[in-house]
Each structure stands twice: as C-alpha cells, then as structure tokens.
A protein has these predicted regions:
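Hydrophobic h-region of N-terminal signal peptides that target proteins for export
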Residues: 12-20
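Short helix-capping/linker turns of helical repeat alpha-solenoids
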Residues: 25, 50-53, 67-70, 88-91, ...
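Hydrophobic face of amphipathic alpha-helices that form TPR/SEL1-like repeat modules
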Residues: 28-32, 59-68, 97-104, 133-140, ...
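Terminal, low-structured helical/coil segments at or just beyond the last alpha-helical repeat
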Residues: 209, 215-279
Length: 279
C-alpha cells in the first residue's frame, strides 16, 4: 500500500527526471544547433525524437532539410517523416512547418490545398503565423480562389495582435486596394508600425552583423545555426521590406499625408500597446 510519503517521493522523482530530461534536451539538441554543431545535433535530436518529443522531432526534420554547405546531403524524406510525426501530436510549430512545406514544394511536392488545411489547423488555435499563412493564400490565390477581402480580414486580425509580417501585408493591402479601399495614409501607418519594431541604429548594426556573418561563413563545414533563428529571420525580413516600401510611399505622398500617417501610427501603437522587437 502506498503511503503519502511514498507518493510524495515518487512525485518528486518524476519531476526531477522531467527537469533533467528537459535540461539534457536543451544542451544536447537545441544548444548544438545554436553552436552550429550540425552532425552532433542530428545525433542528439534523434535520441529525443525517438522518445516521442515533438520539439525534437521538428528540429530533427528541420536539420535534415535545412542544413546547408559542407557537403551535407539533405534528406527530405526523413525531414517530412519527423515533422509529420510531431504535427500529428498537435505540435503547433510542426503543423506550421507542414503548411510551409506543402506551400513551398521543396521538401514535398507542392500541394496548396494541403497547405491550407494545415494553416487552418494552426489558425484555429489563434496562432498568428497560421492566420498570416491563410491571408497569403487568399491574397495570391494559392490553392484557393483569390479573395482579397478574406485576405484583408486575416491580415487585419493578425496585425492588430502585433504580428509584423501581417502588419506589412495589411499596409500593402491599403496601398494596392486589395480587399479594401485604397488609402495611402493607412498604408504608410501600418508599414511604419512594422518598420519601427527596430530603431534605425539597431537596424544598421544588425545589417552590418548579418553582412559580416555572410562574408565570413565557412561553407566548407555544414551550417545549421540559422535554424535556431527562423522566427527572428522572418520578422527581420518583414521589417526590412516595410522600410523599403515606406521609401516608395514617400515619393507618392504629400508632407501633410505623411504627417497624418505618422500620427495615426502613434495612435494605433498606443491603443494596441505595440512594443519593439527584443532581438
């Protein structure tokens, strides 16, 4: 018969094992990717993936398809297998990766309809990347009939929640009159909200750091460090694109319109409590 003391001991042992396993996963899989030890990362992630860890399965799949240079041979079949296993466990990042794989057509044959199904699964959870994915499908008619109004509504939903790529998409919708009446003031406002996620000084420093990293990249060895920064890379790309589009809009707008747009952007940021990116 189990006593209360025995139950407590068992509980503490279970918690201890769980914490220990998480620490091992962090140091044995994720940290190896961050330190660009790609082959070692594959070996370590495989251990945890075989134990059913969905994050490890997703990372392992990403390593097989996303590691580059150094003579590394990509294995798209293994990549898809591991990521799909994690997705079936309802792991959101894996489900999003499934959508992107079907949309991209590199890891598996392009199938926009399947991409839509996975985006919908993720969007139903309120995931902003999933909502943005649906917006892009409807905006460009990928696997679905073009529906600019639907795209606009999805962009708006995610943009109001602070999703940078969606804020860019919303700004472009206003600029191009896609799903909404053309409004350059609102276009400028939303693009500037996205662009201002990083101040100019930090942006220049980041651009220089990225340029230096690319120039000094050792292509004789496998590279996988970038896989630990995919979310940041997506946001940085959106911010950079927003900055370019603002320069274009400045050529098409009056000083009065620009000032009105800046005021609107400040009002939206204050109302929605938007903050700058912390990377």
């Amino acid at each position: 018969m189990l006593t209360l003391r025995n139950l407590m001991t068992f509980f503490l042992m279970t918690i201890g094992l769980s914490v220990h396993a998480e620490l091992d996963f962090q140091s044995g899989c994720k940290d190896l990717i961050k330190s660009n030890q790609c082959i070692e990362a594959i070996e370590a992630c495989t251990i945890f993936a075989n134990q059913g860890n969905p994050e490890a399965q997703t990372l392992l799949g990403s390593l097989y398809s996303g590691t580059r240079y150094g003579g590394f041979r990509k294995n798209y079949k293994k990549s898809f297998t591991w990521i799909s296993m994690a997705a079936e466990q309802d792991y959101t990042k894996a489900q999003l990766a499934m959508a992107e794989m079907y949309k991209g057509g590199e890891v598996v044959p392009e199938d926009a309809r399947k991409a839509k199904v996975w985006y919908e699964k993720v969007a139903e959870k309120g995931n902003l990347d999933g909502i943005n994915g649906l917006a892009r499908l409807y905006r460009y008619g990928t696997g679905v009939r073009k529906d600019y109004e639907k795209a606009f509504q999805y962009y708006l939903q995610a943009a109001l929640a602070g999703h940078t790529p969606s804020q860019v998409g919303l700004g472009l919708s206003y600029r191009d009159a896609k799903g909404v009446k053309k409004n350059l003031v609102k276009a400028y406002a939303w693009l500037s909200i996205a662009a201002d996620k990083i101040d100019t000084q930090r942006w220049k420093a980041m651009e220089k750091r990225y340029k230096d990293e690319q120039e000094n990249l050792d292509k004789s060895t496998p590279q996988c460090k970038h896989l630990s920064k995919l979310d940041q890379m997506s946001e940085r790309f959106a911010i950079g694109y927003a900055r370019q589009m603002i320069l274009d809009l400045k050529q098409r707008m009056s000083i009065k319109q620009i000032n009105k747009a800046k005021k609107l952007a400040l009002e939206i940021k204050k109302e929605r409590a938007f903050t700058r990116s912390d990377f």
